[in-house]
């Protein structure tokens, strides 16, 4: 993996959910428009995959927080 790829992944790892989602939407739009050569398209697709993974991480964390809160509520009621 090239240093620029590592830098990009490190940058994406710091994104909040909304920023990652918004950038992912833009990546999808650009890919749908076409007009890029194969290398550009692949690089953009790889960025989209990293952004999608970041969104999934945020959603998994949110899901866990909700489950934990619900479990705490249920134990308080017992």
From Swiss-Prot:
Enzyme class, first EC level, given as a word: hydrolase
Family matches, as InterPro entries: Exonuc_VII_S, Exonuc_VII_ssu_sf
Catalytic activity annotation: Exonucleolytic cleavage in either 5'- to 3'- or 3'- to 5'-direction to yield nucleoside 5'-phosphates
Gene Ontology biological process: DNA catabolic process
Compartment annotation: Cytoplasm
EC number: 3.1.11.6
Keyword Cytoplasm assigned: yes
Entry's Gene Ontology cellular component terms: cytosol; exodeoxyribonuclease VII complex
Single annotated GO MF: exodeoxyribonuclease VII activity
UniProt entry keywords in alphabetical sequence: Cytoplasm, Exonuclease, Hydrolase, Nuclease
Transmembrane portions of the chain: none
Keyword Nuclease: yes
Predominant location category: cytoplasm
Record-linked NCBIfam families: PRK00977.1-3, xseB
Record function comment: Bidirectionally degrades single-stranded DNA into large acid-insoluble oligonucleotides, which are then degraded further into small acid-soluble oligonucleotides.
Membership in a protein family: Belongs to the XseB family.
Quaternary structure (record): Heterooligomer composed of large and small subunits.
HAMAP family, per the entry: Exonuc_7_S
Descriptive protein name: Exodeoxyribonuclease 7 small subunit
Source species of the chain: Nocardia farcinica (strain IFM 10152)
Lineage of the organism: Bacteria, Bacillati, Actinomycetota, Actinomycetes, Mycobacteriales
């Amino acid at each position: 993996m090239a240093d620029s790829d590592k830098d990009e992944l490190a940058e994406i790892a710091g994104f909040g959910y909304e920023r990652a989602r918004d950038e992912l939407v833009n990546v999808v739009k650009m890919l749908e428009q076409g007009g890029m050569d194969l290398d550009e398209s692949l690089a953009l697709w790889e960025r989209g995959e990293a952004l999608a993974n970041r969104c999934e991480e945020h959603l998994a964390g949110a899901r866990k927080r909700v489950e934990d809160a619900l479990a705490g509520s249920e134990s308080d009621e017992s």
